[in-house]
Amino acid sequence: MMKYGRKYNFGEVIIARVQFTDSFEVKKRPALILFEEYKNVVCAVITSNPKMKGISITKKEGMAVNSIIKLNYIFTISEKMIEKKLFSISKEKCEVIKKEFLNKLD
């Protein structure tokens, strides 16, 4: 369990307990932190499904398996739902994510 009150930062990959909209089941899933405010953490889904569109994040970068960051699937959780931090992505990858996210807003 992560320590409550910790500051979460953009670019951290975490394991979080998530309840998706199509199920009552809570599952542990990797996610990318976009920002944290007032103990609420806004995240982007990370999936290992290679057929999904998004930004790739590889084993070489720290994932257990090659995965996809889905900027079209964003959710907010309480910091209490975060199990642990896995790693932080590179500054270069953060810039790619920011650029892609801003492109989606146009």
Predicted region positions:
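Short, charged beta-turn/beta-strand-edge "cap" motif at the junction between a beta-strand
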Residues: 19-23
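Compact nucleic-acid interaction/catalytic patches
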Residues: 24-28, 33-61
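C-terminal terminal-subdomain/extension
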Residues: 60-106
